Amino acid sequence: MYRVIFNGMNILAKSNNISWSSDTDTLGMQVTFDSLVNLTEGSIISFLINNKEYFRGIIIKKSESKFSYNYTAMDYSFYFKNEVIKQFNGIKASSAITSLLKEYGISSEIVNIPTTINKIYKQSINDIIEDILKQAEEDQGIKYFKEMNINTLVVKRLQDMRIKPKVIIGSDITIESSIEEMKNKILIVSSEESNKSIYATIQDKNNINKFGLLQKIESVEEKNRAQAKNIARNLLKQYNKAIKSTSINLLGIKNAETIRANRLIELNVANKLKGWDKIKSANHTLSNNKHNVTIELEW
C-alpha cells in the first residue's frame, strides 16, 4: 500500500514515522521519516500510495542518531527559491507563469488566467508566481493556488478542488472567529509616488457602523487603472468578513492522501460545519498502519 523508493529500492521496511504536510502559507510539501538507511543530502526519494507516486522530492535535511537517521525531503518547489530577472509586457497571467517556468526547465499545467501582467521582476521564482496569482485574484475575484505534482507545477482554481475522502472524525471541535484581518473600506491608489490620485473607493457602511473603520490601501500601476473598480470590489469581498477556523483530527479510511492544503472538503459535524470548507493546512502521520490527519479549515 505504501512505499518509499530510493534508487529503485523500497526502503519502507527499514523506515518508520513517516509524516507529510502542506500549508497554504508555505512553499511546497515536505515529508519527514526515520530510517536505518544512510542517505545523503540531495538524494531523490519517492513516496507511493497504492502504487501511485504521491510525492517526489529532495533530501534537504538529515540528522544522525546512534542507530538511525531522520530525514526531511521537500518537493521540487525547493528550486523556486532561485532569484531571477523577468519582464512581462501585456501577457496574460497563465502564459506569464508558463513562460517563466519554461525558461528554467520546469514543466507546468496552468489553468487559463486572463489577467494581463505588465511588470519587471527581480526576485525569486516563487515570489513572482505569488505576485501574478495575487494580481489575478484581485482582478478576477477567483482564488488560484499553486502546488507541485511530482515534477510539474500545477496552478488551479480552488473552487474546482473538491475532495471526498472516507474518514472518521475525531472528538468535538472548537470554532474560532476573528476580525483581525477584516477590511470594510478599500482604496485603490497609484503606485507612483508623484501621483496622489485615488482610482477607486468602495466601502461597506453597515460594517463600518458595526466594527468601526478598517481600511486597506492597494497600489496599482497607471496602466492598470481601468481595473481599479473591479480590484476594489474583489478586495472588499475577500476581506469584509470575520474569518472562521477550526482544527480537526481525522483517521483516514480511504483516499485520505487526497487531503492537502488548497482543497475543499465537506465535513458535516452536528450544527458546526456544513458545506464545503477550505483546507488551510494538512498534517499526515503514518505509523503502525494507521493514517492520521490533522487539518485546519478556514472559511
Can you say where each PLM-predicted feature lies in the sequence?
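Short, acidic/charged, Gly/Pro-enriched secondary-structure junctions
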Residues: 1-5, 34-64, 92-103, 256-282
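Sec/Tat-exported extracytoplasmic proteins
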Residues: 104, 133-136, 140, 190, ...
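Short beta-strand-centered interaction patches in the first periplasmic/extracellular domains
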Residues: 68-69, 110-181
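Oligomerization/assembly interface segments of phage tail-like spikes and tubes
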Residues: 22-35, 67-78, 188, 241-252, ...
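Acidic, small/polar-enriched beta strand-loop surface segments
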Residues: 37-38, 148-288
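Short acidic/polar beta-strand-loop edge motifs in secreted extracellular
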Residues: 77-99, 108-131
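Well-ordered beta-strand positions in beta-sheet-rich domains
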Residues: 53-58, 70, 85, 199, ...
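Assembly/oligomerization scaffold segments
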Residues: 1-80, 167-175
